[in-house]
Structure formats: C-alpha cells, structure tokens
Amino acid sequence: MIARGAEQKLELLKQAGGGLSASDVSRLLHISRQAVDKRRREGKLLAVPRGSDYAYPACQFDDDRSVAGLSEMLAARKVNHPWATLAFLVTPEDELGCSPLQALQQHDPKLKDHAIRLARAAAGGDGFG
C-alpha cells in the first residue's frame, strides 16, 4: 500500500500533466541534459524528486519552451520544496480566478504580476514535510 503522502504526490503530478524525464525535457527544449539539470539547480525549471531522479511537471512547458514568467515565479517562491511549489502552481487561487500557472499561461501582464505577488506572499509557509 502506498503511503498517504506518496498518493498525494502522485495525484499532484497527475494534476500537473504528468512528469517528464530530463531526457524528455532536453528534447522538448532542444538543449542538452546538462543544461536541463543546470536550469533545475538554478530554479528556472521545476523538478520533483522521483526515486533517484527527477520528474519535470509537464504543465510548466508551452510547446518547446517553458511557460513565460515561470522562472520569475519560481524565484519569487523562495521555497526550496518542489512539491509545495508544484502544489502552489496548480492549485486555483480565489484572487486570480485560476491557478498561478494558468495565470502565467494567459499572457496577461497584470494577472502575471498578481500571481507573482501571491507567490511571494505564499512563500512564508507550506504544508509539505
């Protein structure tokens, strides 16, 4: 039986469109695997631990690039917990009328700025352990 926390993480990754491997992201973005890893370490791409590797939530990509404004939002979070960050990105916020990630995907500068302000405010505490 899978522990409750593991079930929640699987559901969260499913909600995020599934997880891509570093090789998948490398092909998608037309960059090397080393460049993918560097972007992850720099906080420009979100990756969640999956066994001894990482899964890159598919929702953070638009065609062959990362969602515009994503790296800015990840920097605003200042939380070194990828599962909490993923939950924040895909969970609808009443103030936005959508999830923070959906706000970025709408390419509306005011909505993007509001979502980034929420990311900064939410960085104070997350419920994942």
Task: Name each model-derived stretch.
Residues M1-G129:
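Non-transmembrane "mature" sequence context
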